From Swiss-Prot:
Subcellular location: Membrane
Bridged cysteine pairs (disulfide): none
Family: Belongs to the TMEM255 family.
Lineage per the UniProt record: Eukaryota, Metazoa, Chordata, Craniata, Vertebrata
Positions of region (Disordered): 279-300
Transmembrane segments: 29-49, 56-76, 88-108, 200-220
InterPro entries (alphabetical): TMEM255
GO cellular component, one term: membrane
Protein name in UniProt: Transmembrane protein 255A
PANTHER family linked: TRANSMEMBRANE PROTEIN 255A, TRANSMEMBRANE PROTEIN 255B-LIKE
Annotated source species: Xenopus laevis
Superkingdom of the organism of origin: Eukaryota
Polar residues bias spans: 279-297
Length: 321
């Protein structure tokens, strides 16, 4: 159990670090995808507001381009392993410029929509739409205003104009726009007003969301997935038990260099057993000389057989039949 506790603790730490990395990556992908959606809306509505009329220019779509490119880099970098840090740093740089652009455009578009667009005469039905077959043709119209002299206004084709906002050749009341050229109807002016405020609100949302996204990507760019630790635990070797052990067999040299042993008694020796007198049952004799002479080999008995002995360095004689 003691040897398994460090490995279990290491596995738990690796699992925690891997889970934290995956959680950070999911958060990074979520905020960058959200920023990409917001930037797409900013670009779409900004382009719609810019192309709605000719004489009113809107720059609210620029932050959408910068924030969208930065969010795409963030999505790609969040799914990388090797070049993740470089890609996320580039994403943070673009998002930072997009945040600055969103702040500036939100102020400019908001101020422009609040101070230079007045829809009260349009809602009151005092604006007129002029359309001719010749687009470049200029027409003079007379604006009748109460308590003022009639004024002549030169307008182009496909123009929505409001005489209540025109001040007889001078700048309109508080710099308000009194004509909108290249529109299909006066209702396009209402759409332009709503689009401007929508782009302004989206730029404010993109401003704060870009700050949050840059912070999340900045905390995730230095994180790396933790590899599982390989723990090598040296276990004590167990004693080996040998079964069916064979006795040691002496080598061939032991038999070769040793003195030859005498063989046991042969059948011939047993036939002449009379040469060995039987011992008395009462015990051994007290006379050692007599006892020794009784075990001596008789002179008339044939000699015992013993194999010839040849030294190791001497060859045996050749065989003769």
């Amino acid at each position: 159990m003691l040897t398994q506790q460090p490995s279990q603790r290491t596995d738990i730490q690796a699992a925690d670090s891997t889970g934290s990395f995956n959680k950070r990556r999911r958060n990074s992908v979520f905020v960058t995808v959200t920023l990409l959606i917001v930037s797409s809306l900013i670009f779409t509505l900004g382009m719609a507001a810019t192309t709605r009329t000719e004489n009113v220019t809107v720059g609210g779509y620029y932050p959408g381009v910068i924030l969208g490119f930065g969010s795409i880099l963030g999505i790609i970098g969040s799914n990388l392993i090797e070049n993740k840090r470089q890609m996320l740093v580039a994403s943070i740089v673009f998002i930072s410029f997009g945040v600055i652009a969103a702040f500036c455009c939100a102020i400019v578009d908001g101020v422009f929509a609040a101070r230079h667009l007045d829809l009260r005469p349009l809602y009151a039905g005092k604006c007129r739409y002029h359309s001719t077959t010749h687009n470049d043709h200029t027409t003079e119209v007379t604006c009748q205003q109460p308590m003022r002299n009639p004024c002549v206004l030169k307008i182009r084709s496909n123009t929505c104009y409001c005489c209540d906002l025109y001040n007889c050749g001078r700048i309109g009341n508080s710099g308000l726009y009194y004509e909108y050229t290249d529109v299909k109807s006066c209702q396009d002016v209402v759409h332009l007003y709503h689009l401007l405020w929508s782009v302004t609100i989206l730029n404010i949302v993109g401003l704060f969301l870009g700050i949050i996204t840059a912070a999340v990507l900045g905390g995730f760019k230095d994180m790396n997935p933790a590899l599982p630790a390989i723990s090598c635990i040296a276990e004590t070797p167990r004693p080996t038990v040998q079964y069916n052990t064979r006795p040691a067999v002496p080598s061939y040299n032991t038999y070769y260099h040793s003195t030859p042993h005498l063989p046991p008694y042969t059948a011939y020796d047993l036939q002449h057993s009379s040469v060995f007198p039987a011992s008395t049952p009462s015990g051994l004799s007290d006379d050692p000389n007599g006892q020794a002479s009784s075990f001596m080999w008789p002179s008339n008995a044939p000699p015992r057989y013993s194999p010839p002995y040849f030294p190791p360095d001497e060859k045996p004689p050749p065989y003769t039949p």
